UniProtKB/Swiss-Prot annotation:
Organism field: Enterobacter sp. (strain 638)
Annotated Gene3D superfamilies: P-loop containing nucleotide triphosphate hydrolases (3.40.50.300), Peptide chain release factor 3, domain III (3.30.70.3280)
Annotated GO CC locations: cytosol
Protein name: Peptide chain release factor 3
Cited PROSITE patterns: G_TR_1, G_TR_2
Domain of life: Bacteria
Keywords: Cytoplasm, GTP-binding, Nucleotide-binding, Protein biosynthesis
BP terms from Gene Ontology: regulation of translational termination
A GO term, aspect molecular function: GTP binding
Length: 529
């Protein structure tokens, strides 16, 4: 049976994001992936912050200064017969809720682990978010050209800490200065590593078969014997790859390599193309929407301001769930019930914006937005429904915002509410006083907010520490008990940017005690947009 042209386009799409701890090599791997997709000709490794050859996926002024990728950009490139959409996730200490939310817009994730360090804190947090939707995960063990921990030990740590089974697809031969390449367990081939070829795609020398005498010549007798011994152990002790379990988010295929040396990245990409799901169905408040449906639907997962310093615009990033976007089509913005004609949607090659004529499920398009679009907005061809599963996450860091000029309180509030609708920060207004508290997931968000308040709203503000450890959205089905809870805890209650009641806890101990005291009240860590 031949698929219709529309379904052929859907079947080509793969949409994924990379999750890692800062400095595990995420930006480098992004560069190399784009190199294989021929989207850039030579990879501009992210050098020291002063260097002029900035990596392609880092943009916005503050990023250029700090050498980090703050804003979640989107890159589309062809690979084999597929079209891959890679959503970049800010990786530094200065990442934000955008990073979390981006993970709700992809069908698959690539987890990059520094094989010398193993599982790190940020990776744990991001994996928790992928668990909300049981997203399939591929794993790349990076930095094999350095001295690493025992690969078996690192895989055990992944299984233990991230609660996901590991199925090695390739296995390293040596590491550091002795790194010779990898063996592919399912193709029975050895791929040999050459140093100094990191900026280009290299022809890799292949030795066919583990028992091939050429192996000794290529890697030396000692490493060849060691490899065969290790593989007996690996085959006995590790899981076999199972596609069904991978799609359910229960097992991850593991690839070894070095992103900086541009080795092993293509094995991982081949696995992604072969195993990652096509665009997946998504839930709305009324029904499940399948990618095969021909009527257009999509949702906004992120809004970014000033992608173009020359134009002070905001761009809303929309993930297409079903149907085909065509230039000039009329779409309904469901939340406000208004029809809009969209003739200037954008596609992205990090920072290079180009107008898009058409887009299919799995693609990300940018909509120009002058403050009318919010995170979580659903666009359809008329059907009244709302996509679910695009959450707000309870902030982990809090500051009080203070004005230099007290007469600008109104502009400050307007600016903060708009920034919170964009997902740049969350704002809380305590019920018992006139403070304005902002909450974020990464420290840099506070600097971004102060800079944007000044440039976009002409408000000079400073932030200072505040005695808040965490926040939870509260609700209760028993009106009487809820009233009593509100009366007795007024000093800890606040309204967020969308006027939702929030409990602001000065310490985790306070939160735990309050939760025990009021078992009928629900304290939530995430809230639907």
């Amino acid at each position: 049976m031949t698929l219709s042209p529309y379904l052929q386009e859907v079947a080509k799409r793969r949409t994924f994001a990379i999750i890692s701890h800062p400095d595990a090599g995420k930006t480098t791997i992004t560069e190399k992936v784009l190199l294989f997709g021929q989207a850039i000709q030579t990879a501009g490794t992210v050098k020291g912050r002063g260097s002029s050859q900035h990596a392609k996926s880092d943009w916005m002024e503050m990023e250029k200064q700090r050498g980090i990728s703050i804003t979640t950009s989107v890159m589309q490139f062809p690979y084999h017969d597929c079209l891959v959409n890679l959503l970049d996730t800010p990786g530094h200490e200065d990442f934000s809720e955008d990073t979390y939310r981006t993970l709700t817009a992809v069908d698959c994730c690539l987890m990059v682990i520094d094989a010398a360090k193993g599982v790190e804190d940020r990776t744990r947090k991001l994996m928790e978010v992928t668990r909300l939707r049981d997203t399939p995960i591929l794993t790349f063990m990076n930095k094999l050209d350095r001295d690493i921990r025992d690969p078996m030990e690192v895989m055990d740590e992944v299984e233990r800490e991230l609660k996901i089974a590991c199925a090695p697809i390739t296995w390293p031969i040596g590491c550091g200065k002795l790194f010779k390449g990898v063996y592919h367990l399912y193709k029975d081939e050895v791929y040999l590593y050459q140093t100094g070829k990191g900026h280009t795609i290299q022809e890799v020398r292949i030795v066919k078969g583990l028992d091939n005498p050429e192996l000794e010549t290529a890697v030396g007798e000692e490493l060849a014997v060691q490899l065969r011994d290790e593989l007996e152990l690996v085959k006995g002790a590790s899981h076999e790859f199972d596609h069904e379990l991978f799609l359910a988010g229960e097992i991850t295929p593991v690839f070894f390599g070095t992103a900086l040396g541009n080795f092993g990245v293509d094995h991982m990409l081949d696995g992604l193309i072969e195993w990652a799901p096509q665009p997946m169905p998504r839930k709305t408040d009324t029904r499940l929407v399948e990618a095969s449906e021909e009527k257009f639907t999509g949702f906004v997962f992120k809004i970014q301001a000033n992608m173009d310093p020359k134009h002070r615009d905001r761009v809303a990033f929309l993930r297409v769930v079903s149907g085909q976007y065509e230039k000039g089509m009329k779409l309904r913005q469901v939340r406000i019930g208004k029809d809009v004609v969209i003739s200037d949607a954008l596609t992205f090659m990090a920072g290079d914006r180009s107008h898009v004529e058409e887009a299919y499920p799995g693609d990300i398009i940018g909509l120009h937005n002058h403050g009318t679009i919010q995170i979580g907005d659903t666009f359809t061809q008329g059907e009244m429904m709302k996509f679910t599963g695009i959450p707000n996450f309870a902030p982990e860091l809090f500051r009080r915002i203070r004005l230099r000029d007290p007469l600008k309180q109104k502009q400050l509030l307007k600016g903060l509410v708009q920034l919170s609708e964009e997902g740049a920060v969350q704002v809380f207004r305590p019920i018992s006083n006139n403070d304005l508290i902002v909450g974020a997931v990464g420290v840099l968000q506070f600097d971004v907010v102060v800079a944007r308040l000044k440039s976009e709203y002409n408000v000079e503000a400073i932030y200072e520490s505040v005695n808040v450890a965490t926040a939870r959205w509260v609700e209760c089905s028993d009106v009487k008990k809820f009233e009593e809870f509100k009366r007795k805890n007024e000093i800890q209650l606040a309204l967020d940017g969308g006027d939702n009641l929030t409990y602001i806890a000065p310490t985790m101990v306070n939160l735990n005690l309050t939760q025990e005291r009021y078992p009928d009240v629900q304290f939530r860590k995430t809230r639907e947009h």
